[in-house]
Structures are given as C-alpha cells and as structure tokens.
C-alpha cells in the first residue's frame, strides 16, 4: 500500500507508483513524500549532514508489525529537470526514483552490493516499461 504526502503542486493519480509498491512490498505500507528542492536540501542536511538537494532519499523504519516499511522522499523539481534533460516524462522519472528508493528500503545497497540492486532495478524497469534506471545513468 502506498501513502502519499504531496507537498508540491504536482497533480497525478500515482497509479503507476501504486502498482510498483504492490509488486515490491505487497503487504507493507510505503510512505512517499514529494517535496521541493529546498525541503529536500533541509532533509538531507538535517538527517545526513549533506548540505545540498538530492533527487531521492530513503528512510527505512524498524521491522515492527503494522508500521510502514519506510519513507521515500522525492525532490519533484529536480525530477522534472532530469526528465526534461533525459527526454522522458516526469511520471517516469518519479517512478524510477521511487523504485530506487523502495529497493533501499528493502535492504538493497548499490554502493556495497555486487550488482543486485542494479539487476533488480533492471527487472522492474522492463516490467513497467520505463527508461534507463538511476543506477544505469550514474555508472561510468
């Protein structure tokens, strides 16, 4: 199940994100928070000590029954900028960021694993007919 806290003017039905959430965590609640660039910078600074706005952050919660899996925070203006630059829709960019964030909630870590997160993202991108993944775009 997906709970959305949209703190931006973005209007969407978020059906694609609901489908992704149901595939990745069919029995768990995922909180999605859509924020401005400034809010993302504040969150990143306050919680991670990094004083810049990033595109997506994930905050897993403890595995306590009946609580959300965690929160995925997406910087909507930066997602829009990247979508325009890469030539695909904002909806697709947010879906890519959401997949990336939820995989982190599920314990994947592309900075430490041996390609498992990259492989899982690839599978989901094919399943949902999305453009190049976040990890693929940032590979050298």
Curated annotation (Swiss-Prot):
Taxonomic superkingdom: Bacteria
Segments crossing the lipid bilayer: none
Any single Gene Ontology cellular-component annotation: cytoplasm
Leader sequence residues: none
Molecular-function GO term, any one: RNA endonuclease activity
Compartments, record wording: Cytoplasm
Pfam families reported in the protein's UniProt record: YbeY (PF02130)
Binding site for Zn(2+): 100, 104, 110
Major localization listed first in the record, in broad terms: cytoplasm
Cofactor note text: Binds 1 zinc ion.
EC class of the enzyme, as a word: hydrolase
EC numbers on record: 3.1.-.-
Stretches assigned to coiled coil: none
Keywords: Cytoplasm, Endonuclease, Hydrolase, Metal-binding, Nuclease, Ribosome biogenesis, rRNA processing, Zinc
Cofactor: Zn(2+)
GO biological process, one term: rRNA processing
PANTHER family reported in the protein's UniProt record: ENDORIBONUCLEASE YBEY, CHLOROPLASTIC
Chain's role: Single strand-specific metallo-endoribonuclease involved in late-stage 70S ribosome quality control and in maturation of the 3' terminus of the 16S rRNA.
Family: Belongs to the endoribonuclease YbeY family.
NCBIfam families the record matches: rRNA maturation RNase YbeY
Name of the featured protein: Endoribonuclease YbeY
UniProt source species: Helicobacter pylori (strain P12)
GN (gene name): ybeY
